[in-house]
Amino acid sequence: MEREESCETHPLLKGGRRKEKGYSHGLSSSQMHVIAAICEALFPSQPLDSQNNQSSVDKALSAFYTASGSQAPLPDEAAELLFKFNRSFPEALSLVSWVLLILSFRLGTLLLCGTLCLDWRWPFIHKFSEIPLEKREEILKRWSREKCWIPLRLVFVLTKLVCFYNLFSRADVNGHNPIWKAIGYQVDTREKLTQKKRPLQEGLIETMYETDSTLIQSLTEKGLEVTEDLEQNMYKIKCDAVIVGSGCGGGVAAAVLANSGHKVIILEKGEYFVSHDYSSLEGPSMNELYESGGILPSLDGKMMILAGSTLGGXSAINWSACIRTPDSVLREWSEKHKIPLFASPDYQSAMDTVCRRIGVTENCNKESFQNQILRQGCAKIGFKVEPVAINSSADHYCGSCCYGCRTGDKKGTESTWLVDAVGNGAVILTGCKAEKLNFTLKDGDNGTKRKTCSGVIASATWRSKVTKKLQIESKVTISACGSLSTPPLMISSGLKNPNIGKNLHLHPCQFAWGYFPEDMTNFSGNNYEGGIITSIHKVFEEDSTSTPRIIIEAPALGPGSFSALVPWVSGLDVKERMVKYARTANLFALVRDHGSGEVKAEGRISYKLDKIDRESLQTGLRKALRILVAAGAVEVGTYRSDGQRIKCRGIKESDLEEFLDSVRVVGGPSSRNEVWTVFTSAHQMTSCRMSATEEEGAVDENGESWEAKGLYVCDGSVLPSAVGVNPMITIQSTAYCIASNIAESLKKQN
């Protein structure tokens, strides 16, 4: 079955609730009273003075200050977001649920809130929901600073996150949120690229439109050999190569293998969207296009991680930056890690091929508000700033590509490599998740037995009516589901190499902000408009002029994501910050991390920030603040929990230096410091790294598993170490080389 063609926004990317059957968060009414009281304290009604005139903007502003976080349905929607943690971080949901329950009782409130819940009148102790608003605000301030009982701070962090993210990213059925006008935000409504036929339709099977009976017909119509196994309730499908994942690695591998004449099946757990499907709405788009709906923390809560989860993977939602692998990194990989591929002409040729296929251009005809500020700030203090190549045209002025490119200008794998693959007979199954790799034992060298991968077991995701499992039997199996998902798939399938899931690098980031009022600065536009990354400032290692230790760039932060990061020091303060949203420029410092983490099970990510990385981030954060001040910001600050900031108009150099000296990179919410911060990551690499020996990594220099013949890894997890810049070109080029070798080996087998 196929989805009916329409030029309307895809139903999954529209605003409004799609289900009218109530909420599934499972919280009791007493717990909901508590969460509503917390939301009200976080975002209280603060009516403006009546002397404001009654222009439409002032009316919107007045309504914004009057609005409260306790207004229905906001608390229920925040609770629904909390429920997202249940799959990957159930301890967090349990913790919040228990605290909400305790706070619904008087003695429990006394235990967690202390004397602020006491009253001279009967019954002398208030439940949390009965405590006056001002005192509830004070309780939340104490929780934010709590150093002894860290679970209370984590409850504060999680409830703040879901309250504000929901409040500012939600949209109704018409794609509208009444508070956006007050903060100067407008959803991208430019004309979309409309295509009569979706580019991948010929090779596409969308399981959410299939049933058991229609699926076998769809598979057969695509030229696949399918048999039904009634005893095991599964369909068995044969092909030359099965690829799990469709992003920067999987998309390239699919094209190379299909172009070589092999029958390829691509499995993608996400759904397929094209340009006219996209809504540019932050909430629905993040929910459908990102892993865990864009809310994916590390186990200790210090790292918030963004990863793509749609057809095209991260290439469909990334920020367009196309940076070739630095020469110094290639030397390190070829010499230190002893992988000759990265010193070869083949790799250089692969980078050229990749850049051609995804339409990389070095030019940008009009820079965005944030990139103008980065460039001008650097120029004023003598920092070198370089242009960043992008995989779109020079006229591409789109700030919402992180929600899918509605103009179709940006070239992700879903509009390039996968189109090539489908044109050569590849079949794509969306809404289809790999559960387990299949292995058989075959004779190896020296009379020993070696595992050989014979394919994969997969199942349709929850939207589908397909109940049968899919057993895909293949000559080669490629895991390309990314650094967060490839290791759990391999480990849950029985592979034992201890390097699988370890050495995870995340390119940790810290953000700085500067406020540029429209009437006081000469920068045009708003922070959500224009190309996302078109300029870069690099900070090099002391002994090198080619290895960036830190890079400073501009991010995409929709109002929901911005509000979730903003420090909360009071309800009034957060409202005053949010009305400045549109003209608040953000810059981030990213480090090529020495520290690493691990991911052994889905969504269970741990990460340790190395001391060197902390110092580098501190250097980068101070430089970012200096750039913002030089560009003319009237106020700058960090996202540290205490709301660290300084007014800049007419500031003395000595006062600025004193402020910058106070900027430290502190620990996450689980640290026992009074102030804390949250780190972010949009690049995940090296969790199944390529190595010269089995003791050093998970796969060999051809991307093949050391443990299982015929099993390859073809995504960012194979990189030997962190790249230090956006890894898209590196991942695609590495995938191109690995897939070319696989195609050659299949040719020899045949």
Swiss-Prot record:
* Disordered: region residues: 1-24
Q: Which locations, inside or outside the cell, does it occupy?
A: Membrane
EC number of the protein: 1.1.3.20
Residue positions annotated to bind FAD are: 239-254
Q: Where is the active site?
A: 683 (proton acceptor)
- SUPFAM superfamilies listed in its UniProt record: FAD/NAD(P)-binding domain
User: Which reaction is recorded as catalysed by this protein?
Assistant: a long-chain primary fatty alcohol + O2 = a long-chain fatty aldehyde + H2O2
Gene Ontology cellular-component annotations: membrane
* Major enzyme class: oxidoreductase
The family annotation for this protein states:
Belongs to the GMC oxidoreductase family.
Q: Can you name this protein?
A: Long-chain-alcohol oxidase FAO2
Which source organism does the UniProt entry give? Lotus japonicus
State which gene encodes it: FAO2
